[in-house]
Amino acid sequence: MAAVACNNSNPLIEGWNTPYGIPDFGAVKEKHYVPAFEAGIAQQQAEIDAIIANEEAPTFANVVEAYEASGAILDRVVGVLFNLSETDGTDALNAVMEQALPMLSSHSDNITMNPAFFAKVDALYQDIENLGLNQEQKMALKKLHNSFVSNGIALDEASQARMREINAELSSLSNTFGNRLLAENNAFAAEFGVTISEYGEAMAATADRALREKMFKAY
């Protein structure tokens, strides 16, 4: 019963019935994000476990399509948080990102370093020309297969552990860079009334030489 109550009180887990599926931003609070990430990761892991446990021969439908259909909660929470963080990077959202990114990095590694899951994907990939797939399906299979290879499925255990560390560090550094870039853009807009992306137009439009010099130095 507790889990049901949690789901009903968290729009990121429960979802929303809005036109075109637009997120109900007004209902989403900072406290909802981490529990939604935890629920989303658990949901997708269970869905992947079901793909692996399927005793039928691997097919595009029961492996690739099943994987692409997984992670509905995680897709929802990532879509909301990342878009808000990139446009309205408040301290509260930044704190959420710092909690969420290591969880996401670990979850992604758990997927692409899973030998049982890769075995099913690889079986399809090795027989790709005989599966009757169209070009879009072939591309989807190749992309999924490459996600395992590029993330170290063939590495030994020690090397995979190092890969996990690198992925976590890259995720953290990318977030830090994004936060600093947004802060610089906001500071520029606060001082000059235009964003950095509007810099070129503003420089061409203003006749104030002193202002252009000031904007140039700030840019």
Where are these regions (language model features)?
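Zn2+-dependent metallopeptidase catalytic domains
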Residues: 6-219
